[in-house]
Amino acid sequence: MSARVPVKRTAKLFIGGAFPRSESGRSYEVFADDGMPLAYAAQASRKDLREAVVAARAAFPKWSGMTAYNRGQVLYRVAELMEGRRSQFRDELADAGATDPDRGVDAAIDRWVWYAGWADKIAQTLGTSNPVAGPYFNFTIPEPTGVVGIVAPIDQSLLGLVSRVAPAIVGGNTTVVLASERSPLLAVSLAEVLATSDVPGGVVNILTGITAELVPWLASHMDVNAIDVTGVPDELRADTDRAAADNVKRVHRAPDADPFDPEAQSPYEITALMEFKTVWHPMGA
């Protein structure tokens, strides 16, 4: 009897809840930290990015229309599913060069839980009832911005990714994520978790590929309302900021901090990608 040939995973894109190959048919080789080849990942094109933005926009009304409590439950479910696949994430973190992969997996799961807990507390803690000199009620409430582009950090391919995606979607935004070019397999594994969770298709869209090729198109896309440039390389930051200014995108860059530091998680990372609306209402006689 011949020896069984194991089934190799093909690292595809994640767009609209599905796993398509790049429309260009391109892929690029991914290497382990020791230089050994690991896999081939799909190399997303400009058209793939456009498709991801369309999927994110289509998913926005349903996701933003859910109650904050329900969104928190959905994020908690993601943490539950990651817990069940922790050995896979641990092995992939080790391949990516993590010195303590168990710590990295624990921190990523805990970050989902932390932001899930904030889902139904943002409006109460950061929204306000404003005193005004007149017969009016005046309220300020947070609302999601819309479609958010995210450039994931290169060196923290799991915790860094979760730390950018979780605060963006818990507030009701939908996202188009450029995964770490160097270690994209962890992003693909996270996409597989999201696909089997309660996160609606299109809320998180993950593209693997060449960062320098995709960032300009993400930053300049007119239907992207905000962009998190935390993972943009220094040499691309000025051009990214200029491209984002064309449609007055909200541009956010997380503070420089160790992602394992509790200070790296903050409710202000949620509101950085939200808008605050002030409403006036007459009191009546």
Map each language-model feature to its residues.
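Residue-level signal for inorganic ion chemistry
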Residues: 35, 71, 172, 204, ...
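Hydrophobic/aromatic ligand-binding patch that stacks against planar heteroaromatic rings
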Residues: 166-169, 217, 243
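Short acidic active-site motifs
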Residues: 136, 213-214
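Terminal low-complexity tails and localization/encapsulation signals of metabolic enzymes
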Residues: 1-41, 73, 77, 107-113, ...
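Conserved small-residue-rich beta-alpha loop and adjacent elements
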Residues: 117-200
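Periplasmic-binding protein-like
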Residues: 166, 226-230
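Active-site donor-binding acidic/aromatic loop of nucleotide-activated sugar
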Residues: 206-209
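Glycine-rich loop-to-alpha-helix module at the N-terminal edge of alpha/beta enzyme cores
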Residues: 34-123
